[in-house]
Amino acid sequence: MASHQDQASYRAGETKAHTEEKAGQVMGASKDKASEAKDRASEAAGHAAGKGQDTKEATKEKAQAAKERASETAQAAKDKTSSTSQAARDKAAESKDQTGGFLGEKTEQAKQKAAETAGAAKQKTAETAQYTKDSAIAGKDKTGSVLQQASEQVKSTVVGAKDAVMSTLGMTEDEAGTDDGANKDTSATAAATETTARDH
């Protein structure tokens, strides 16, 4: 009987040892899987953070490029307007001896129009640059259309200034010294003013 009891006790101990061993294996496998899942999650988080940083850098670079282009466009418009204004002054000085005070008055009007046009171009370019900066900060990628709009506005303004100056000087040069020429020149100045107003 004692032998039978010893045998049962031995089997119970053996079963307990097997159970503990299996439980240890299951626990070890669970720990390994948990560690592996943690590593994967950490790697995915790092990858996502890297992508976010890349996107932020790209947006920042695009915003900087847009700002530089807007600045270049503004400078080009300023240079063009300055050149047009200088040409008007040179032409006025050359023609003043032939046409007297009438041409001087018209030249002053042309200078004022050129200055107004330059101011409007500068203001429009500044507004466009501010809009570009705000859009970039908000993460919007509208740089291309904004730059195209700025370029068209500046071109339109510069062409308006040139047309106003050329119209004023051209009419004065063709019709210098006659009352009829003075009337035509006044009409041309009014038309140029209307064109410039529409461009604004």
Swiss-Prot record:
Coiled coil: 52-81
Cited Gene3D superfamilies: Apolipoprotein
Biased composition (Basic and acidic residues): 13-23, 30-42, 53-81, 88-97, 105-114
Composition bias type Low complexity, residue spans: 115-130, 186-200
Cellular component GO terms held in the UniProt record: nucleus
Keyword Cell inner membrane: no
UniProt KW keywords: Coiled coil, Stress response
Expression triggers: Induced by abscisic acid (ABA).
Transmembrane region(s): none
Role of this protein: Involved in response to stress.
Name used for this protein in its record: Late embryogenesis abundant protein 19
Organism this protein belongs to: Oryza sativa subsp. japonica (Rice)
Gene that specifies this protein: LEA19
